[in-house]
A protein has these predicted regions:
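Interfacial/gating helices of multi-pass transporter permease domains
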Residues: 4-29, 146-147, 186-190, 194, ...
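Membrane-interface helix-capping segments at transmembrane helix termini in multi-pass transporters
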Residues: 11-22, 48-60, 71-102, 142-149
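Residue-level signature of transmembrane alpha-helical cores of multipass secondary-active transporters
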Residues: 27, 66, 94-97, 121, ...
Length: 251
C-alpha cells in the first residue's frame, strides 16, 4: 500500500515490469534449488529440537544439500544470461535479483519455525522491512535507479536471512558434528515429494509474468503486475472487513 505506488510512479510500467519479469524467472530457479526443503526441514527440525546433537547434524546436512542445489541454480543463471535475449537486455539487474537464490539458501527460516522461535522471526521481519522501506525512499529517486529498486526487492524480502544464518551459532554445536557421518543427500528423496506441490503453486503464481514477458515486453508485465496487486489488495480488504451480518450480530 505504501511502497508500490511510490515505486510504480518512479519506475513506470516498464521498470516495474522488468524487475517482476526477472523475478519470475529467478523464482523458478529458486524453486528447484529449494526442492521442497523448507517444508520438509521444518518437520525434521521439530522432531529433534530437544536433542542438540541430532538437531545440529540434521541442520548441517540440510544446509549442505541446499548449498549443492544452489550451485546448480547459479549454473542455470549463467546459462540463461548467455542464451536468453530478453535477459541480456539488463544482465546486471538479473544477476542482482538472482541474489534471492543465495539468500534463500542461507535463510534457514525453516530452522526457526521448527524450534518455534516465532518471536525472533516476527521482530527480525519487522526491522528488515522497515529499513528496506526507508532505503527505498532514500535511494530510488529516478528511473535510472532501477538497480537500487532491484536491491530493495531482494533485501526487503530476504535481507533478514543473513541474520538468520549468523544466529545459528546460538543453537548449533561444532563439537557435535562428525563430518564423515553426515549424509546430506539422504534428505533429497523425501524433499522431492513436497516439491511437486510447490511446482503447482509456483506455476499458478508466476507463469503469467514469465509468459507475458517473453510474448510481449516489460511494460506489459508492469501493467499486469499493477492490476494483480490491486486485485489482491481488494480481495484482502473484502475478507478482512466485517460483513453486515457480523456487525448486526455484534449488536
Amino acid at each position: 500500500l505504501i511502497t508500490f505506488p511510490y515505486a510504480s510512479r518512479i519506475m513506470m510500467a516498464d521498470g516495474i515490469g522488468q524487475v517482476n519479469f526477472f523475478q519470475s524467472i529467478i523464482s523458478y530457479i529458486s524453486l528447484f534449488t529449494c526442492l521442497g526443503i523448507p517444508m520438509y526441514a521444518i518437520r525434521e527440525v521439530a522432531k529433534v529440537r530437544d536433542n542438540p546433537e541430532k538437531m545440529t547434524r540434521i541442520t548441517v546436512e540440510i544446509l549442505l544439500l541446499h548449498a549443492f542445489l544452489t550451485l546448480l541454480g547459479y549454473m542455470a543463471v549463467a546459462v540463461i544470461c548467455l542464451t536468453v535475449t530478453k535477459v541480456q537486455t539488463d544482465i546486471p539487474l538479473f544477476l542482482l535479483l538472482s541474489a534471492t537464490i543465495f539468500f534463500t539458501a542461507i535463510g534457514c527460516e525453516w530452522f526457526y519455525q521448527g524450534i518455534e522461535d516465532f518471536k525472533y522471526v516476527a521482530i527480525r521481519g519487522m526491522v528488515v522491512k522497515t529499513i528496506s522501506v526507508i532505503l527505498l525512499f532514500l535511494l530510488v529517486k529516478s528511473k535510472e535507479d532501477i538497480l537500487w529498486y532491484g536491491a530493495y526487492s531482494v533485501l526487503g524480502v530476504l535481507g533478514g536471512n543473513i541474520f538468520n544464518f549468523v544466529r545459528l551459532r546460538k543453537y548449533l554445536h561444532k563439537d557435535m558434528i562428525e563430518f564423515r557421518a553426515l549424509h546430506p543427500f539422504s534428505h533429497l528423496k523425501p524433499a522431492i515429494h513436497i516439491f511437486a506441490f510447490n511446482v503447482i503453486v509456483s506455476i499458478y503464481l508466476q507463469l503469467n509474468n514469465v509468459l507475458l514477458g517473453f510474448m510481449k515486453d516489460a511494460e506489459a508485465v508492469g501493467y499486469f503486475t499493477a492490476a494483480t496487486k490491486i486485485l489482491v489488495i481488494t480481495i484482502c480488504l473484502l475478507y478482512t472487513s466485517p460483513s453486515p451480518r457480523d456487525y448486526a450480530a455484534s449488536r
